[in-house]
Amino acid sequence: MAQLYAKSCLDQNLRSLEEWKQDAFTQFGEMVGDEADTFPCVPGRQGFFLDHLRYGFVGDLRGDGAVNELAELLKEYQGCAKQTGQYASFICFFETPQDLKESPIEEFEQQFWSLLQRLHQKDEVPWPAEIPLDPHHHEWEYCFHGEAYFILCSTPAHKLRKSRHFPYVMMAFQPRWVFEKLNGSTKFGQKMSQLVRKRLKAYDQVDVHPSLKWYGDPTNHEWKQYFLSDDEAEKPASAKCPFTALKNMMKL
């Protein structure tokens, strides 16, 4: 059974876990908490050091077991997230066999959306009324168990976009309420955006991706930010979101 962890718990009990889990968490800590302070996501770095983040380990994302484990972890996380701190985020590490590690980035993207589709099918709670059903609406966000999440995916196939590279498949689920003070309408949010973009330019070997915009911006589509390309290519305006699980609901 998958378990939800705090950093403080993992620091004390890491050696009791499987080797790949030890390696994943260790490498995450080295990346986010690097001594040179280069990791571009400042809120994520703050959340790591303040123990606001929660962690989970699941199986290969291509299997049904991973979907079931992720569903249970997100249910548990939804019940405690607001008590973890202002930089809350759930970090999920996926077991990543060698054959998957060697896959092209397109395969990872396909598997990412397949996982979200299958995860939605496990959802027992109605889609929140305040979140649009259409992914192409600028206020759409992925939801599970009644909670809206901004999601980002990192993979071994991301090479140039170092900020999205990780030796295992890793997904971060950030509750939408985290951004109530951290958005384009607040001075704090504006300053943070400028700082993160500056750090991204120094960290990645490609420019800041053009899809990275604020939630609520009429030109923004959250789904395009979930899985970024390894280059500067932006999906065309006519591109359709791979998440189609809500199609029938939209027709009602």
PLM features per residue range, with description:
Residues 131-168, 183:
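Aromatic/basic-lined ligand-recognition segments
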Residues 1-85, 91, 99, 107-126, ...:
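Non-catalytic accessory regions used for complex assembly or targeting
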Residues 155-197:
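Compact mixed alphabeta submodule
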Residues 92-97, 174-175:
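Short loop/turn segments at strand-loop or loop-helix junctions that form parts
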Residues 105-112, 164-169:
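"Short basic amphipathic alpha-helical interaction patches in structured regions
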Residues 146-148, 177, 247:
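Solvent-exposed, flexible loop/coil residues
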Residues 97-101, 157-159:
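Short acidic, S/G/P-rich loop/turn micro-motifs used as interaction or catalytic elements
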